[in-house]
From Swiss-Prot:
Entry EC number(s): 2.5.1.143
Gene Ontology molecular function: hydrolase activity; transferase activity
Cofactor(s) needed: Mg(2+)
Function as written in the Swiss-Prot or TrEMBL entry: Involved in the biosynthesis of a nickel-pincer cofactor ((SCS)Ni(II) pincer complex). Carboxylates the pyridinium ring of nicotinic acid adenine dinucleotide (NaAD) and cleaves the phosphoanhydride bond to release AMP and generate pyridinium-3,5-biscarboxylic acid mononucleotide (P2CMN). LarB can hydrolyze NaAD directly or it first forms an adduct with NaAD that releases AMP and reacts with bicarbonate/CO2 to generate P2CMN. Is required for the activation of the lactate racemase LarA. May also be involved in the activation of other nickel-pincer cofactor-dependent enzymes.
Protein origin, superkingdom: Bacteria
NCBIfam families: LarB
Signal peptide: none
Catalytic function, reaction form: deamido-NAD(+) + hydrogencarbonate = pyridinium-3,5-dicarboxylate mononucleotide + AMP + 2 H(+)
The protein's name in its UniProt record: Pyridinium-3,5-biscarboxylic acid mononucleotide synthase
Cell membrane found in the keyword field: yes
UniProt keyword annotations, A-Z: Cell membrane, Magnesium, Membrane, Transferase, Transmembrane, Transmembrane helix
Stored Pfam families: AIRC
Length: 246
């Protein structure tokens, strides 16, 4: 597929009419695969390419989407991908890397950080790490340096204070917590940077699969906290990446 510059050069040389050029440019924005209409123009519009949501898609469908995207951009990120599904598609994508804790797949080399600033990913407990790793892998794939600060929840708050220099040095802080979700408010009261809070479904009984943590974060008294959906490490990292690269 010709690039935009190549198409414009053909028009300038009289080898292609403006109408034909416009048609080629429009056609190059998507890839119709029958089961998916892949957005090839998203990176130009939004700054980051389309990310594949692996849940609910077959291995064959994911391979097709990756192959379409790879014509335009690398690296390519797939989220919510089980180990079993990765094993099924790996023969077709031998260079793919599986991040087991995050349940993410990347194709293509991770880019160097685009800015000197970094994103801190902070968790309350070890059980929150799958969501944290989804956030960290997403942020790294989008060209950000990530500092991981794990297992520093309020049950042993001295652990948090020992890492405050790292957290305060970040341009954006992602705080991930289940149970009652108090860590986001604590961090929000200690830093002068944007805090993106991610409630997780870690907990039982009246944690209500993360609803309690979500409501705690939404009702935080600490200013400067933004809250995303339960277990949405990807969404937090996407927003944090936009802030870090402004």
């Amino acid at each position: 597929m010709a690039t935009t510059a190549e198409i414009l050069q053909q028009v300038a040389a009289g080898q292609l009419s403006p109408t034909a050029a416009a048609q080629q440019l429009e056609a190059g924005k998507t890839a119709a695969l029958g089961f998916a209409n892949v957005d090839l123009d998203r990176q130009r519009r939004n700054g980051f390419p389309e990310v594949i949501y692996g849940a609910g898609k077959t291995a064959t469908q994911i391979v097709g989407i990756v192959q379409a995207l790879s014509q335009q951009t690398l690296p390519i990120l797939t989220t919510r991908l089980s180990a079993e599904k990765f094993a099924a598609l790996q023969p077709a994508l031998p260079t793919a890397v599986y991040h087991a804790t995050a349940q993410c797949m990347t194709v293509g080399e991770q880019p160097a950080p685009k800015t000197p600033g970094y994103i801190a990913v902070v968790t309350a407990g070890t059980s929150d790490q799958p969501v944290a790793e989804e956030a960290a892998v997403t942020a790294e794939t989008f060209g950000n340096r990530v500092e991981r600060v794990y297992d520093v929840g309020v049950a042993g708050i001295h652990r948090l204070f020992a890492k405050l220099d790292v957290i305060r040095g970040a341009r954006v802080v992602i705080v991930i917590a289940g149970m009652e979700g108090a860590l986001a408010s604590v961090v929000g009261g200690l830093v002068d940077k944007p805090v993106i809070a991610v409630p997780t479904s870690v907990g039982y009984g009246t944690s209500f699969q993360g609803m309690t943590a979500l409501l705690t974060m939404l009702n935080s008294c600490a200013s400067g906290i933004t809250v995303v959906n339960i277990d949405n490490g990807f969404g937090a990292a996407y927003s944090a990446s936009m802030v870090n690269q402004m």
